[in-house]
């Protein structure tokens, strides 16, 4: 902020998804997910919060997941981190008392690098059966939802956007 003179918006989009079953005990992967998916959003939000409050406006877009709305076998820890993103979004919205526009986006199956981080064979098999790779849509569609949220004037707040392929079950 000191270098560039100001910030009007931030998109907290970093995330990892090494899905696994609880019984697999992949604690290191769970810790990494918590560090990136929760702490990353917290630290990014904190980096701009006071600046936005001082200037009287700002926009925060947090990327969660449909896994932050529904838990599936193998996604327990990942879902917990994405539920946390929603909680951070709601809390930030309340703490800013209408000064900061906070949007939480919940993408479904889109073409990204996330699935490559899954190492648990049982989870890979479950996901293959669900066929999510076949219905995944281009990530640009999520980018358009981010753009939509950022284009709103100060009088409008888009709180939540759930975006998923039509063929994907919620």
Predicted segment positions?
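Conserved amphipathic alpha-helix within the SDR
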Residues: 1-6
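Substrate-binding pocket helix/loop in short-chain dehydrogenase/reductase
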Residues: 21-22, 29-34
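Active-site helix of classical SDR
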Residues: 45, 81
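Residue(s) in the substrate-gating loop at a strand-loop-helix junction
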Residues: 65
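Active-site loop immediately N-terminal to the catalytic Tyr-X3-Lys motif
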Residues: 23, 70-76
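Active-site-adjacent segment of SDR/Rossmann-fold oxidoreductases
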Residues: 70, 91-100
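C-terminal helical subdomain
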Residues: 104-105, 124-169
């Amino acid at each position: 902020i000191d270098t560039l003179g100001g910030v009007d918006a931030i998109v907290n989009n970093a995330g990892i998804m090494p899905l696994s079953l609880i019984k697999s005990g992949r604690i290191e992967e769970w810790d990494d997910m918590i560090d990136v998916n929760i702490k990353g959003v917290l630290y990014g939000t904190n980096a701009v919060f006071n600046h936005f409050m001082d200037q009287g406006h700002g926009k925060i877009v947090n990327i969660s997941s449909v896994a932050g709305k529904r838990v599936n076998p193998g996604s327990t820890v990942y879902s917990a981190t994405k539920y946390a993103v929603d909680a951070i979004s709601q809390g930030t919205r309340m703490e800013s008392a209408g000064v900061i526009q906070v949007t939480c986006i919940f993408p479904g199956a889109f073409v990204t690098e996330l699935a490559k981080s899954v190492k648990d064979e049982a989870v890979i098999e479950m996901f293959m059966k669900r066929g999510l790779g076949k219905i995944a849509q281009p990530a640009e569609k999520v980018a358009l939802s981010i753009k939509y949220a950022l284009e709103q004037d100060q009088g409008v707040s888009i709180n939540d956007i759930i975006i998923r392929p039509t063929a994907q079950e919620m």
